[in-house]
Each structure stands twice: as structure tokens, then as C-alpha cells.
Curated annotation (Swiss-Prot):
GO terms for molecular function: basic amino acid transmembrane transporter activity; L-arginine transmembrane transporter activity. The lineage of its organism: Eukaryota, Fungi, Dikarya, Ascomycota, Saccharomycotina. It comes from Saccharomyces cerevisiae (strain ATCC 204508 / S288c). The chain crosses the membrane at residues 14-34, 40-62, 72-94, 144-164, 185-205, 216-236, 250-270. Keywords: Amino-acid transport, Membrane, Phosphoprotein, Repeat, Transmembrane, Transmembrane helix, Transport, Vacuole. Residues 35-39, 95-143, 206-215, 271-317 are cytoplasmic. This is Vacuolar arginine/histidine antiporter YPQ2.
Amino acid sequence: MSCSNGIWPTVSNLCGSLSFFTSVISLFPQIIETYRDKSVDGLSPYFLLAWLCGDITSLIGAKLTGQLLFQILLAIYFLLNDSFVCGQYYYYGVLHENKLATVGHEPKPLLPELVENGELLREEEDMIQGGSSAESPRSSRRRSAITAALAIAHTISTASAYPLNVGSTQSQVGPPGDGKNSQLGTILSWIGASFYVGARIPQLIKNYNRKSTDGLSPFLFATTLLCNITYNLSIFTSCRFLDNQNKREFIVNELPFIFGSAGTIAFDLIYFYQYYILYATDMQLRELERELYSPEEDSAAQLVTERTSLLSGETQT
């Protein structure tokens, strides 16, 4: 039975569509994360540079191999997205030297130092001794956070881990045709794939040295992981592969694109291992720091205090 009469074309099309959609939105979580953190301390500049070079080679390769207009436009779209991330790196990291970092996103979390100096212990004692029976929600949250911080501080270790990196699923150009341009396009495809996979190396080193995944959006890795898996599934469930008499030649032609996407899956999985297990303590400390020293909560508490004072003054008069 022909492949076109079975379920595989539908599976391939669905996987291809899902891969395309997730690749389009993959960088948005990281852009939002950087904007909220106001810091790029967790990003390696060499990673971004290699990523950008991969975009450029992919765009040139798509042009030389005569890809469709939408594929070329997609390559330009990814190039613009990555350029925007590079712009964020320049603004927050170079221009402001990460000094705009919001609470909990400093190079090192502050809570271990506070615990070490006994400041959190003193603050907890003050809360216990001076607290009223009608404890405010703000005080309750701070007290819970301090207790948790003290517990975590006793279990902090300097465990090393396999570093990881963020991944990108950029525009994938199709198999090249004939001629010198095609050969050059094939070479550029391999170079682009190597850039995308190799870009992870400096980021791995960065994460390893920091012992933290702060500043890297987990949603970026979720979308790229899903994108890379569905991209490869779309290739191997397509009729072009299933009906091909020479599957080896087909795989050889597609190899740079398979390598560029499948080569990142292992790194994405390592990231989740780091994020949820190896460096979970660091993330917990940063979360507690945001809970303890959130400017919004402090402002709200100050506003309540001011209003209470005003009401008390009006009552006395």
C-alpha cells in the first residue's frame, strides 16, 4: 500500500506544523525573561554570537539553494529575533553592566550571605517577639520564607553538574539541488548546523561556572525540545522517506538538518535535569529572595501603614 493512502502523511504534516509553530514562538519566552530580569548575567555572549552566525549561514544557504520565498522570509524572521536578543544583551549587559537586575536575579543570591551573617535569624526573632496576634499576610509570608530559607541554607552544597545550554531551532532549508550554488548551500547548511549545536558549548561552561540556570527561560527549552522532536518525526514519517527506495541517500541529504535539530535534544534534556534537580536550590533561594524583598510588596505594606496612620489621626481629631 502506498504511503499517501495511509496515516503517515497526516502524522508528518501535523508534526511539521507543530515544529514550525513552536520554532516561531521559541524565543519569546527568553525575550520576556530577560526583560523581567533586567539582566543577561546568565547568557554567554559567545553563545549568542554563534547563534547569530548560524542564522546568517542558514539565510545564505536558503537563498543559494533556491528555497521558497516563505522559507527565506522565515530565515530573516529568525535572524531578526536573534538580533533582538543580542540587542538586549548589549543594553542590559554591556551598557548597564547588569546593574539593572531585579531582585533575585543578581549574579549570586543574597540569602546565603544573610543567613551566614545571622541577619535572617535576627529578623525572625524580631517577628516572633514583636509580632501581634493578628499577624499581617505580609509578615506571614516573610516568616514562612525565612523559615524555608534557613532550612535550605543548611542543605546548600557545591555540587558540580553537567552544564547545558539553551537551544534554538532555526529555519531549516531543504535539500539542495544541483550546481555550484547547491554545493555551497550544502556546505553552509553544515556550517549553520554546527553553529547551532556548537553554540551550546560556551553556554554549558557559563552554567557550570555559575552553578545556576537563572536567567534562562525553561519555556524556551520546552518549545525547542518539542520543536526538534517533531521536526525529526516529520522527516521520518514523510512519504518522501517511507516510499524512498534509497533511504540511505535520503538521510545523507537531510543529515545537516537532522544533525542541527536532533543534536540539541540531549542538551535540552540536560537543562531540565539541571533546572529541576542539580541547581534547584539556587532557584529556590532566588525565589525566596524575591518573596522577602519584593519592592511591590514593600510599597503595598508602606501604603497600608500610611493609610492606617492617616485614619488614626482623623479619629483622634
